[in-house]
């Protein structure tokens, strides 16, 4: 799928939108909660992907594109909500905050790559359902009700599982020496 990007073919963006457009839009929409901002973010994601390939050769492409969308949506979200906080995205971030620090930002305390590797290793220890729930909540920023429907369970069950997963994550990070 990255070949058209290397050839600088105009079809690259069309194919990207066809194959991964829904996922990109969902990531942006879950963070921004606004169709106009979502559409702008999706278009910026396509442009960012066009600029990033080449030189990057992402595999898998979907993860690469969703990461660009997530970063752009997060920046736009923070710009839009500098004064007000309370969306489900803030709630999801606040849930994870206790796993990482005592008020300092993650960037101040840890090398992002090391933390990312540790979280990926932790996720590999989880069963499929827990990994799915954690990823849908903290990567895709899905609302709890949507996750419950996708996992064929109750919202309360998802909430309890996320709490237990966060506790396991805290213990894992302490064991790995990344959290004191």
Language model regions located:
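Short alpha-helical "packing" element that flanks the helix-turn-helix/winged-helix DNA-binding module
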Residues: 133-134
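Acidic, proline/glycine-rich intrinsically disordered inter-domain spacer in sigma factors
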Residues: 94-124
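DNA-recognition helix of helix-turn-helix
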Residues: 74, 119, 130, 139, ...
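Structural recognition of an alpha-helix C-terminal capping motif at a helix-to-coil junction
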Residues: 40-47, 51, 59-71
């Amino acid at each position: 799928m990255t070949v058209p990007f290397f050839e600088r073919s105009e079809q690259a963006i069309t194919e990207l939108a066809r194959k991964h457009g829904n996922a990109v839009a969902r990531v942006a929409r879950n963070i921004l909660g606004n169709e106009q901002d979502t559409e702008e973010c999706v278009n910026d994601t396509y442009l960012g992907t066009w600029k990033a390939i080449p030189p990057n050769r992402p595999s898998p492409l979907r993860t690469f594109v969703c990461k660009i969308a997530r970063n752009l949506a997060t920046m736009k979200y923070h710009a839009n909500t500098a004064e007000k906080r309370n969306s489900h995205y803030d709630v999801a971030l606040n849930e994870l905050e206790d796993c990482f620090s005592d008020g300092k930002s993650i960037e101040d305390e840890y090398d992002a790559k090391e933390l990312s590797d540790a979280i990926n290793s932790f996720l590999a220890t989880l069963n499929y359902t827990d990994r799915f729930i954690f990823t849908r909540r903290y990567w895709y920023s899905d609302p709890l009700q949507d996750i419950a429907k996708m996992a064929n369970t109750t919202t309360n069950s998802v909430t309890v599982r996320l709490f237990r997963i966060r506790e396991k994550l805290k213990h894992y990070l302490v064991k790995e020496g990344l959290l004191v």
